Amino acid sequence: MSQQNRRVQQNTAAFPLLTAHDILECLAALDIPAQMEDLTKPTAQSTQSIYGSLLEVLMGASINSIEGPKQALLGMMEYKVLSFRSMKRTQINLSRQEMYSDTLQFMMFFKHCRRLALLCGIPDFAISDLARPDANRLRKVLSGIMNFAKFRDERMQTQARFQENLQKHQKKAVDLRRKTEELETQFQEITARNAAERPQSEQAQKRNELLKSELLELNSQRLKEVQEYEELKKERQTLLEQVNHNNRIVTQLELQIGSAKSRLVQSPDRIKRHISEMSFAIQSEKAKLASFQQKARELTNRLEVIGALEVDLRGLIDLEHSIQDQRAKTEEAKRSKSALEARLEGRQIESQGLAAKLEQLQRQLQNASHKLARQEETRKGMRERGARRIDELKAEYKVRARERGEWQKQRDDLLAEQKELESEMAAFVTKHENEINEFLHAYWTMRRQAEDYMNTMTVKLGLQVQL
């Protein structure tokens, strides 16, 4: 019964059965030594050797990798023997352990082979396939494994590309995390430095506001002083002109007095009176000159004070410029801080996006593996449906071929009728072409006359036609 089930499953396999020659070529391509007798007349030793090489090539599980777990299990068995049996029966238990060693190794080897067979679409792999191999059975199992190997080679490039992209994204995520940590460290340092410099900044800002208000007051006072200075300068110029004019008058009077003294005195009383008047005028002019000189000295002192104020004002203006420079630097530092915060947020968002993309790629990889398994499951059904569909299409094709012959005859008849109708239409058109041209000429003449009549009536009636 089991052999019949195996034959049915062999006939409905989800993969094509290869010939022994093709299987030998595939094994040679995988660097697995095998001969034709190993496939036509298999033995347990040759079959296990081929399966062991396939496990090592396709799954990376060699015989040496089975040795470690086997020794661990045997050690557990030895621990149980020494725990629940007396120490006198140690040699008997050790002989049992040696007896179990080969059986345990064979069962572990069978488990790996069965896992490979399940992956290749062979669910009925049994111990008899290793202990008592059959040529047809071995050919079926190796055909499934070779199909799996070919499919694996075809999909290895895609898997390697996904793996490479995954490694790149992981590396990029690590770099972004490192950069994010550096930016967070810089941000914390800047925040701490700003917090430490905040009292000084507030004091400097208050001092700047006080200096600014004082500077505004001094600037307004400077404008007033400059205006007053200009007025005093004009007044000083006017007084200097008056002093020069009076000096010229005094010089002329002295010259006149000298010339008068050199003359003969004919009227002493009049001359004395005139001299006393001139002496009084000279004294008054000297008093004016002394007052002008005192006023000029006062103006000079005020000009010196104004010059000192102007120097102080220039110093305050320079201080204002330096304050503005410091304020600009502070604003620039604030802008750089905002830019660093924005960059930090951008890096965090980018890191989150890359992490989400990495998770998405992992989900895509899992979905691709699940999809591959589903495709392997559905491929068998698709093959059966395809075979049934091919048979149905063949039957339908035969029916359609018969119908096609009938339709071909009808088509030929219709083509002959079409040619006759076309010849009749051509003869009719050539016969009545002159009449059609006359009808068209009369139609266009009547249409132009009607349009002229409508335009004339519109103009005479004063109608406005909106188009």
Swiss-Prot record:
Keywords: Cell cycle, Cell division, Centromere, Chromosome, Coiled coil, Kinetochore, Mitosis, Nucleus. Pfam families: Nuf2, Nuf2_DHR10-like. Gene3D superfamilies: Ncd80 complex, Nuf2 subunit. It is found in: Nucleus; Chromosome, Centromere, Kinetochore. One of its GO terms (biological process) is attachment of mitotic spindle microtubules to kinetochore. GO terms for molecular function: microtubule binding; protein-containing complex binding. GO terms for cellular component: Ndc80 complex; nucleus. Residues 159-249, 282-431 form a coiled coil. PANTHER family: KINETOCHORE PROTEIN NUF2 (PTHR21650:SF2), MEMBRALIN/KINETOCHORE PROTEIN NUF2 (PTHR21650). Belongs to the NUF2 family. Acts as a component of the essential kinetochore-associated NDC80 complex, which is required for chromosome segregation and spindle checkpoint activity. Component of the NDC80 complex, which consists of at least NDC80, NUF2 and SPC25. This is Probable kinetochore protein NUF2.
